[in-house]
Amino acid sequence: MHPIRCEAVVLATMDYRESDRIVTLFTLCHGKVRGLARGARKSMRRFGGALEPFARLSVELVVREGLSSLRGVDIVTVYPRIRQDLAAIGHGGYAVELVDRLLPDGASVPRLFRLLVSYLEHLDQGGASPSDRRFFEANLLNILGYRLSLDACAACGVEFPADAARRAGAAGTVLCTGCGRYGAPLSAETVRLLHRCLGTGRFGAIVFPPEPLGEAGPLLDGAIGAHLARPLNSLAFLRQLTP
């Protein structure tokens, strides 16, 4: 097979044998790919310091079912300011692990690739905020087909008037007050801000005040957790840094 050249973001790496490294890449043209970088741990000539999480690369690889072959890389950016700030490291590590865990191998999702790159660029410019994390999560769920259903009760199907009271149910569902009488309340402002997250493509444009942030967070956490077999490794560190 002939090698192809494609833009990619490094999601994860793992040492393999004495000198090799297995790299999980989110590529623009082939989706998530795991590639074997031969000699990456001993030789700096072919890969340099490029094979680190968050790095955005132009990669040359031979795509195969299972484990692809990574032939070479050119660095687009390693997002140096992310690596100098603990909050940015926490948010960036969470973002790439979340994409890795939710995206199946070989699924090409250009919109999600652009969302992740935009988030990493925003973090590199000092934008590590809880609001931007929730913006990223809401849009990621939407792109992958897990969009939050904010306008009708997940249990009985009744449509909500614009300012109707809502309750948060299990697994990120939204319920009417009759079906979700014991669920945490969701204010009209929280619902409005979540709708706005799905209507704008710009990080930093939406800021959740403390109360809506406290309501939106568990709802999004539940929606994401419903699609994960186990908790994210990066989440414990992120929770130490931010709400």
Curated annotation (Swiss-Prot):
The keyword DNA damage applies. GO terms for biological process: DNA recombination; double-strand break repair. One of its GO terms (cellular component) is bacterial nucleoid. Pfam families: RecO_C, RecO_N. The keyword Aminoacyl-tRNA synthetase does not apply. Keywords: DNA damage, DNA recombination, DNA repair. InterPro entries: ARFGAP/RecO, DNA_rep/recomb_RecO_N, NA-bd_OB-fold, RecO, RecO_C. Involved in DNA repair and RecF pathway recombination. Belongs to the RecO family. This is DNA repair protein RecO.
